[in-house]
A protein has these predicted regions:
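Formylglycine-dependent sulfatase
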Residues: 8, 12, 21-471, 481-502, ...
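Short hydrophobic beta-strand that contains or immediately precedes a catalytic carboxylate
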Residues: 474-475
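Residues forming the ATP-binding cleft of Hanks-type serine/threonine protein kinase domains
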Residues: 478
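Extracellular ligand-binding/catalytic regions of CAZymes and related secreted enzymes
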Residues: 519
């Protein structure tokens, strides 16, 4: 059980103000009585690329300027999860991990180009077998037709922000990003409309499991018309690392990672938002200094991003109101999360994929009035592969042994198992595709992070053939939570790095990701591991 916050100075004070005396730890046992508890309804709301820094309950630099009162409400009436992490920070693989409770190397979805095996015994099917009426609405992004759901109405591929197409059950399925019928309106509103419509028409004799998945705030950050003037007169606070990165890297100064500045000429925000055709309008940087250009590109990016978040928060409120109006709130688990995090200018980056904190961390708030006390804060290390086992345990059904995740139901009720994980394994496979981020894997503990950038495509679908120089990064998260100082070469930390390398190999073996199928990577490991 972890009893501190990573961003102690800001987050602890904010949580103390909001949650009172309950904000200093994983709060004690729930006083709710689960005896004779009927199966809970479950609403799993997931957005796309929603950074913790863009949810006000987390107390970031954006909290006051861009509040999210409805998402915050879930936390205030339930639990705020501080240490939830993705196992492969990219849309399709993360969604597959959530459904299967497995890492990419087991579920077979390594990259955006891989098809999800819809014959697998995933969360939707298991909830059906447990007696639930099941539905998924919104972003699916797994290529193959949804299975395990009594109803689906999903976006083709990434989908559109305005007047989106949706593919409804009962009509011939067309692969991935093909097919669908147009629904007039803004996508976040439409997805909520269709989610509520299903709730109204569901089988009332069964508990329900609804996955309501939003496209926003994924790029290209097209906001609703009603939000076009939101934040116009505001100055968005900038992370210090937007301009200065200390000893972060070493690739920060090179052509890697999509940048806010023009540092990476292959993909950067400054070029995107100054060229004709950008969907939310362009900015004029003529005559500006380099720093002014970066500032302007950052302001444009984050304002558009936060405008899409505003619509999400409004629609979360609509779901909560529906539950209240229909007297369903008490016995309904409501979860809000994202498929991964997002960099909002930190280290001069946008996008996800990296093992850095802003990409690795997933927001998560959970409310279940029947069993979870309000105003809780949980600091246990939870992974996206834990979501399915947790929901299955709440549903009162068996968790398949093939799932690599573990239920954190008892953690939510204030009783963290003594053998709960204190470290996690991460791997990004889609080498150099789209945002020019090398293939890498690593280990994160409560205090440290070790990353090996191996820089090889390994014949993965969609990975680029460009080979990058292998290198290591090591961060002391307790003393350097912003990851500004790569201490891999620091003599003081060599014993810790050595121990982490051993633990990393143990995790890879346990998780069936040994690299033995990739002789070129094994050769690289033999050369660069010590």
């Amino acid at each position: 059980m972890i009893r501190y916050f990573q961003e102690f100075s800001v987050l602890t004070l904010l949580s103390a103000f909001i949650f009172g005396c309950n904000s200093t730890a994983n709060i004690g046992h729930s006083d709710k009585k689960p005896s004779n508890q009927k199966q809970p309804n479950i609403i799993f709301i997931m957005s796309d690329d929603h950074a913790k820094n863009a949810i006000s309950i987390y107390g970031s630099r954006l909290a006051e300027i861009a509040p999210t009162p409805n998402i915050d409400r879930i936390a205030k009436e339930g639990v705020l999860m501080n240490n939830v992490f993705v196992t492969n920070s990219i849309c399709t693989p993360s969604r597959a991990a959530i459904l299967t409770g497995q890492y990419s190397q087991l579920n077979g979805v390594y990259t955006l180009k891989d098809d999800f095996d819809n014959s697998t015994n995933h969360l939707g099917k298991l909830m059906q077998k447990a007696g639930y009426s099941t539905a998924v609405v919104g972003k699916w992004h797994l290529h193959t037709e949804p299975t395990g759901f009594d109803y689906y109405n999903v976006l083709p591929g990434q989908g559109l922000y305005n007047n989106p197409k949706l593919k409804e059950i009962g009509k011939p399925w067309k692969y991935h990003n093909k097919g669908g019928e147009v629904y007039e309106g803004y996508v976040t509103d439409v997805i909520t409309d269709e989610s509520i419509k299903w709730l109204e028409n569901r089988d009332k004799n069964k508990p329900f499991f609804l996955m309501s998945h939003h496209k926003a705030p994924h790029g290209l950050w097209e906001f609703a018309k009603r939000h076009e003037n939101l934040l116009n007169d505001e100055e968005i606070p900038e992370p210090n690392s937007l301009y200065e990165n200390g000893n972060h890297g070493p690739l920060i100064g090179e052509r890697y990672g999509s940048s806010i500045s023009d540092r990476n000429p292959r993909r950067n925000m400054l070029h995107q938002v100054t060229r004709e055709g950008w969907p939310t309008g362009i900015i004029d940087t003529l005559g500006m200094t380099k720093r002014e250009k970066i500032h302007s590109a950052y302001q444009k990016y984050v304002k558009d991003y936060l405008r899409t978040v505003a619509a999400i928060d409004e629609n979360v409120g609509r779901i909560l109101d529906y539950l209240d109006d229909n007297e369903l709130a008490e016995n309904t688990i409501v979860i809000y999360t994202s498929d991964q995090g997002q960099l909002l200018g930190e280290h001069d980056y946008f996008d996800k994929r990296w093992m850095y904190e802003e990409s690795l961390s997933m927001p998560m708030v959970i409310r279940y009035p029947a069993m979870i006390n309000p105003k809780q804060v949980n600091n246990d290390m939870v992974l996206n592969i834990d979501f399915a086992p947790t929901l299955l345990e709440f549903a009162g059904t068996e968790v398949p042994s093939k799932m690599q995740g573990r239920s954190f139901k008892s953690n939510l009720l204030g009783s963290t198992p003594t053998d709960w994980r204190t470290s996690m394994y991460y791997r990004y496979w889609m080498h150099m595709a789209h945002h020019y981020i090398p293939g890498h894997y690593g280990i994160r503990t409560k205090e440290y992070k070790l990353i090996f950038f191996y820089g090889l495509p390994l014949n993965r679908n969609g990975a680029l053939s460009e080979i990058t120089e292998p290198y290591w990064e090591f961060y002391d998260l307790k003393n350097d939570p912003k990851e500004m100082n790569n201490l891999y070469a620091d003599e003081k930390y060599q014993h810790i790095i050595k121990e982490l390398k051993v633990e990393l190999l143990v995790k890879k073996q346990k998780l069936e990701d040994t690299d033995e199928s990739y002789p070129e990577l094994m050769e690289l490991r033999n050369k660069f591991w010590n």
